[in-house]
């Protein structure tokens, strides 16, 4: 927030064009002794890249379903091309660093805008910087509650767990979700939330978005404006790289980290839509190979 004030920016960007404008103004504050960047995108971090890319209006990297077949979705995709051009221009104009240690730079007051998750809150609080939390922009500035942003973590009990271990894990999960050991449920009906549950307390203290409806609908969670503003709708798509049902999620995610960095650092300057088509043809082929390997 201090960088925003020094740069004369009064409003939080709600569009990607406004992000660029803010990044330019904040980057102008940089000196040789104290480098400052207006934008802090992690070009190597798959999940955060995907969150940004989806806000441009594109779908999964790989679309379709098992019945009708899957297909790669990098080419002939205007929204994807727009996202890639925007990311690269931020870097080429000197508004976004190449470094991967964006967290430390943010904590040092050297980054104006960044994407991250609730796990960073403790670091930022400890640093003492004056910061705020807002939803990612969109192309038009309209909110897109239909996309879940960032990381939605889950508890799982593996098939290799012993009966004793599985039972202990189940008891912990029930306690975490309800605070009482009651069976976890999908609605708030018949559940006493007069006391804050461990799950809700953790979300509130970390400012971490929650997908468990009883927690989201609890009065404690609803009392935190920033959580309410950022929590996706109940019908939101979970942020993923590939359409549900694919068997190569991790391969596709790894591919994305490679191609975003390759494009940003090695792609042509002043890129066009056609440049994106030419550059990503090989990565489109890589994704098609994943599909063929798993389903042919």
Set out the residue ranges of the language-model regions.
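Short helices/loops that flank or line small-molecule/ion binding pockets
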Residues: 4, 24-26, 100-114, 258, ...
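Conserved C-terminal helix/tail region of periplasmic/extracytoplasmic solute-binding proteins
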Residues: 5, 225-296
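Glycine-centered hinge/linker elements that transmit conformational signals in sensory
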Residues: 23-25, 67-99
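Short, solvent-exposed loop/beta-turn-alpha elements that line the ligand-binding surface or hinge
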Residues: 30-31, 59-82, 138-147, 239
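Extracytoplasmic/periplasmic substrate-binding proteins
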Residues: 44-51, 85-175
């Amino acid at each position: 927030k201090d960088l925003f004030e020094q740069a004369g920016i009064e409003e939080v960007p709600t569009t990607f064009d406004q992000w660029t404008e803010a990044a330019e103004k904040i980057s102008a504050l940089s000196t040789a002794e104290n480098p400052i960047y207006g934008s802090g995108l992690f070009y190597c971090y798959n999940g955060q890249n995907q969150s940004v890319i989806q806000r441009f209006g594109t779908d999964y990297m790989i679309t379709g379903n098992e019945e009708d077949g899957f297909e790669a979705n990098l080419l002939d995709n205007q929204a994807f091309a727009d996202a890639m051009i925007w990311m690269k221009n931020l870097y080429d104009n000197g508004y976004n660093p190449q470094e991967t240690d964006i967290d430390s730079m943010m904590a040092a007051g050297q980054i104006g805008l960044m994407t991250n998750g609730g796990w960073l809150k403790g670091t930022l609080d400890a640093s003492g910087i004056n910061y705020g939390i807002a939803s990612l922009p969109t192309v038009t500035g309209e909110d897109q509650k239909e996309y879940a942003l960032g990381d939605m973590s889950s508890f799982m009990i593996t098939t290799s767990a012993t009966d004793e271990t599985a039972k202990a894990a189940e008891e912990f999960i029930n306690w975490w979700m309800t605070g009482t050991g009651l069976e976890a449920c999908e609605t708030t009906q018949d559940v006493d939330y007069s006391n804050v549950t461990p799950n809700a307390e953790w979300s509130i203290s970390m400012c971490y978005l929650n997908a468990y409806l009883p927690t989201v609908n609890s009065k404690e969670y609803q009392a935190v404006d920033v959580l309410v503003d950022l929590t996706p709708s109940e019908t939101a798509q979970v942020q993923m790289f590939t359409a549900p049902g694919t068997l190569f999620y991790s391969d596709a995610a790894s591919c994305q980290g490679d191609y975003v960095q390759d494009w940003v650092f090695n792609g042509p300057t002043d890129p066009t839509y056609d440049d994106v088509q030419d550059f990503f043809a090989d990565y489109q082929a890589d994704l098609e190979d994943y599909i063929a390997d798993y389903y042919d």
